[in-house]
């Protein structure tokens, strides 16, 4: 009975610690550009090639960066 109570308290304490840590780290992600590039590399969608024509829609779909003045993917 005592051991069960100790285990329950330990689990509750560890759960609380995990929630506190997760809440504190929200919005502090480092290297966002790297994460974006990683997401694009594992994407199953067809991407436009570098130097291809792009606009805001294509840029948001796949192009890493769109030079809107020239209208090309860089």
From Swiss-Prot:
Propeptide: 23-45
Keywords: Disulfide bond, Ion channel impairing toxin, Knottin, Neurotoxin, Secreted, Signal, Toxin
Cited Pfam families: Conotoxin (PF02950)
InterPro entries: Conotoxin
Disulfide bonds: 47-63, 54-66, 62-73
Listed name of the protein: Conotoxin Bu4
Originating species: Conus bullatus (Bubble cone)
Coiled-coil zones: none
Record remark on domains: The presence of a 'disulfide through disulfide knot' structurally defines this protein as a knottin.
Keyword Kinase applies: no
Annotated GO MF terms: ion channel inhibitor activity; toxin activity
Family: Belongs to the conotoxin O1 superfamily.
Subcellular location as annotated: Secreted
Signal sequence, start to end: 1-22
Keyword Secreted annotated: yes
Superkingdom of origin organism: Eukaryota
GO cellular component: extracellular region
Expression sites by tissue: Expressed by the venom duct.
């Amino acid at each position: 009975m005592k051991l069960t109570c100790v285990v329950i308290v330990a689990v509750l304490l560890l759960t609380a610690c995990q929630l506190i840590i997760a809440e504190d780290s929200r919005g502090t992600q480092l290297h966002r550009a790297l994460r974006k590039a990683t997401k694009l590399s594992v994407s199953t969608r067809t991407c436009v090639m570098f130097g291809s024509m792009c606009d805001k829609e294509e840029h948001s779909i796949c192009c890493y960066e769109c030079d809107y003045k020239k209208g090309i993917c860089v």
